[in-house]
């Protein structure tokens, strides 16, 4: 199983310039209970998408305030899906079910039927 990527103020820009993948980013705080639960979900998402063009990443907002500011993080956990075009496709605040995170990523991948694309 691959390791979840740790993005930071210093490596974010160069990483995003180089990647051509969809990126799921979890903005978290080490003292946030729901954030700790979501961090355990990241390994599940990593395994689920290991054969897809998706990178699972996390950002500690305490250690990386510039990156948190760039994404206008006001509450954690914040989950963001960045498309291959480098644009934010979806952002959700709070702890969601693992199925909801999968739907967020699948939508960015173009998966799902007509109704999933409309209402997903």
Language model features with spans:
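N-terminal targeting signals for export/organelle localization
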Residues: 1-2, 48, 110-120
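Short active-site neighborhood of thiol/selenol oxidoreductases, capturing the structured segment around
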Residues: 18-30
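N-terminal "domain-start" segment that seeds a small globular fold
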Residues: 1-15
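Non-catalytic, surface beta->alpha helical segment in thiol-disulfide oxidoreductase systems
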Residues: 75, 80-117
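Structural microenvironment flanking redox-active thiols in thiol-disulfide oxidoreductases
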Residues: 61-68
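The canonical Cys-X-X-Cys-His
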Residues: 32-35, 79
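Typically the conserved alpha-helix immediately C-terminal to a functionally engaged Cys/Sec
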Residues: 34-48
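Hydrophobic beta-strand anchors of alpha/beta hydrolase catalytic cores
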Residues: 24-25, 56, 79
